[in-house]
């Protein structure tokens, strides 16, 4: 009943599975009234007397994958997950690379938007190079917000290749030991799992590898 009355959702595909993702809320005034009846108090950060440190933004611009516009126009592209280029079948006596093929089919407005976002982040080699450069630029603790599990796995591989301790907070995994005890750790946080709550103030640098569907998760993540 709560979801039906107060939650706005849309169906999205994550790692090959379809699920409902929260995109916003409705009947908010009614929800606040109901919660207030049970003792809830609503305050802004300023009203609560919380002073957040000044934020300094460093924009690192990267181009989308070269395959982005081809997909956007054709609504289809086959990605080679090994090199993030366009897939070309390579088979010989010893085997083939067919297992590396990822077909992106934008046959609906939702799938078209989803895969377009992935081509800007998950399947964009330039993003990973920019991430590597950022990690090499500091030995401080880093928080990295991401969307898709495959993004995290690729980023984690880069971090471990640079001998950086890794922590993960996602819907499937919670391991924050490196974050707590290693000054040069990198903590990967899935938006849905950690953007709305959690205290990560041991770190003072955040990397947004890719942006979420809606602005609310991004805005809340800045207060972690």
For each of these PLM feature ranges, what is it?
Residues 1-140:
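Inter-lobe coupling linker of SF2 helicases/translocases
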